[in-house]
A protein has these predicted regions:
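A short alpha-helix capping/helix-coil boundary motif
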Residues: 37-42, 62-66, 80-85, 109
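Active-site-proximal beta-alpha core segment in soluble small-molecule metabolic enzymes
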Residues: 73-143
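N-terminal, Lys/Arg-enriched amphipathic/low-complexity engagement segments
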Residues: 35, 43-47, 51, 55-57, ...
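A broad, structural surface signal
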Residues: 56-59, 63, 86, 90
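Alpha/beta catalytic barrel-like cores
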Residues: 1-42
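Structural signal for hydrophobic packing residues in well-ordered secondary-structure cores
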Residues: 58, 62-65, 134, 138
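Short, functional N-terminal and low-complexity linear motifs
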Residues: 22-30, 49-54, 70-74, 96-98, ...
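Membrane-targeting and insertion segments and their boundary/processing signals
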Residues: 27-35, 58, 62, 77-78
Length: 143
């Protein structure tokens, strides 16, 4: 997966978890805002991920998948975080699950090669997008 451009991606107050008055910010600039969950600077509910806990979860999941041979396709649609998609795939997930072709586009833009659509593929534009991706990338796996 190619995450090289993610820090220059922008978000604004319409993005889940961002203060409505925040304006447009590059992801790389969010940490410099001085926002605090405990001061009420960010709209709730929101998810908080501790790096140490994420690392332990990652190690555990990798070991579990290796030991059991289980095949999983975690829900990317919940976080829509390509950084987590990358980690999950590195840990042994066989695909990332999405609910819409818009979510699939995000995955594909960052190089996810195997996607499970947990929905019916309907609509001319949606079908056209998937067919186009399958033609463009013979390695792409659409489940």
């Amino acid at each position: 997966m190619d995450l090289s451009g993610i820090l220059t991606s922008t978000v604004d107050g319409r993005t889940k978890g961002m203060p409505p008055e925040s304006g447009t910010l590059a992801l790389a600039d969010i940490g410099r805002q001085g926002w605090s969950i405990f001061s009420g600077d960010l709209p709730l509910p929101l998810a908080v991920i501790r790096k140490s806990v994420l690392g332990e979860n990652s190690r555990w999941m990798r070991a579990f998948l290796e030991k059991t041979g289980a095949r999983i396709a975690p829900h990317g649609k919940t976080t829509m975080a390509p950084q987590l998609f990358k980690l999950q795939l590195e840990d042994g997930a066989v695909a990332i699950t999405v609910a819409t072709t818009q979510q699939m586009r995000v995955c594909r833009d960052f190089g996810v090669g195997s996607i499970l659509l947990a929905n019916q593929l309907v609509g001319r534009a949606e079908i056209g997008y998937v067919v186009g991706e399958l033609k463009r990338d013979p390695e792409f796996s659409f489940l």
